[in-house]
From Swiss-Prot:
Broad class of enzyme this protein falls into: isomerase
Annotated catalytic residues: 52
Pfam family of the protein (one): PseudoU_synth_1
InterPro entries assigned to the protein according to its UniProt record, in alphabetical order: PsdUridine_synth_cat_dom_sf, PsdUridine_synth_TruA, PsdUridine_synth_TruA_a/b_dom, PsdUridine_synth_TruA_C, TruA/RsuA/RluB/E/F_N
Organism field: Rhodospirillum rubrum (strain ATCC 11170 / ATH 1.1.1 / DSM 467 / LMG 4362 / NCIMB 8255 / S1)
Annotated signal sequence range: none
Gene3D superfamilies listed in its UniProt record: Pseudouridine synthase I, catalytic domain, C-terminal subdomain, Pseudouridine synthase I, catalytic domain, N-terminal subdomain
Gene Ontology terms describing biological process: tRNA pseudouridine synthesis
Complexes and interactors: Homodimer.
Annotated protein name in UniProt: tRNA pseudouridine synthase A
Gene encoding the protein: truA
Length: 278
């Protein structure tokens, strides 16, 4: 058997998440069906993260074992041919050692959440952003977000159905930046609790529109009680951005609709936004 590492991009709308299940189509199922059409053997595809229904990915990493060496380029082209016309694409493939595991070898995972912060609703990005019409201040959100960085009990930001053994996680980075009409929340950690990013975003949104203060956010964290924090942000705006493995460095952030602006740079100042808000 030959093991291949895949980098996968997908639009999560219309799928019941990553993990194969009986009640609807999933990303894992689609990849496994494409792999079967390639090699004629039932193949399990393992992912770095199990994204929920409606959550997207720009850099999900997966691995699978094939019965012989096809060549990475052939694997990528064949899988993409069998995946069409689904909104799933293998954007990179590489042969790896048999001890590589997409989930257990990962050292760090990064997510980006997109909030469309304008009065007009989304058109082309419908289902790909969380639309919030009321004015929000990214700088205030970013300052408050630093309360959550570090090693904490994140019970207040954990889904009731979370299966993790412990609610304690180390959040390496949490940054909030404005990119035009959008507010981007970037989160980086070795691993996350179920719904942790969406629950943090939903709570930070309350800070951004002035309903909460940073002190209240801190109190919510320290309460270790889900009811103490804010609502769960919808899946639409969440993107599994990238995975880092041993020997790799985090990719630099790029300004753009799906990436962060470089830290310290604000493409649109908060004061300008307030003046132009209609």
């Amino acid at each position: 058997m030959v093991r291949y590492r895949l980098t996968v991009e997908y639009d999560g709308r219309g799928y019941c998440g990553w993990q194969r299940q009986d009640n609807g189509p999933t990303i894992q199922q689609s990849l496994e069906e494409a792999a079967f059409r390639l090699c004629g053997v039932a193949t399990r595809v393992h992912g770095s993260g199990r994204t929920d229904s409606g959550v997207h990915a720009l850099g999900q990493v997966a691995h699978l074992d094939l019965p012989r060496a096809y060549g990475a380029a052939t694997v990528m082209k064949a899988l993409n041919a069998h995946l069409r016309p689904q909104p799933i694409a293998v954007i990179d493939a590489a042969e790896v050692a048999e001890d590589f595991h997409a989930r257990f070898s990962a050292e760090e995972r990064s997510y980006r959440y997109r909030i469309l912060n304008r009065i007009a609703p989304p058109t082309l990005d419908q289902g790909r952003v969380w639309w919030v019409a009321r004015p929000m201040e990214a700088a205030i959100m970013d300052e408050a977000a630093q309360v959550l960085v570090g090693r904490h009990d994140f019970s207040s930001f954990r889904a009731a159905e979370c299966q993790a053994d412990s609610p304690v996680k180390t959040l390496s980075e949490l940054r909030v930046t404005r990119v035009g009409d959008e507010i981007h929340v970037f989160a980086r950690a070795r691993s996350f609790l179920h719904h942790q990013v969406r629950n943090m975003v939903g709570t930070l949104a309350l800070v951004g529109d002035g309903r909460w203060t940073a002190d209240r956010l801190r109190a919510a964290l320290e309460a270790c009680d889900r009811s103490a924090a804010g609502p769960t942000a919808p899946p639409d705006g969440l993107y599994f951005l990238r995975v880092r493995f041993p020997g790799e460095t985090a990719a630099p952030a790029k300004a753009g609709p799906l990436e962060a602006a470089p830290l310290g740079e604000a493409p649109l100042k908060e004061a300008t936004l307030k003046e132009d808000w209609r």
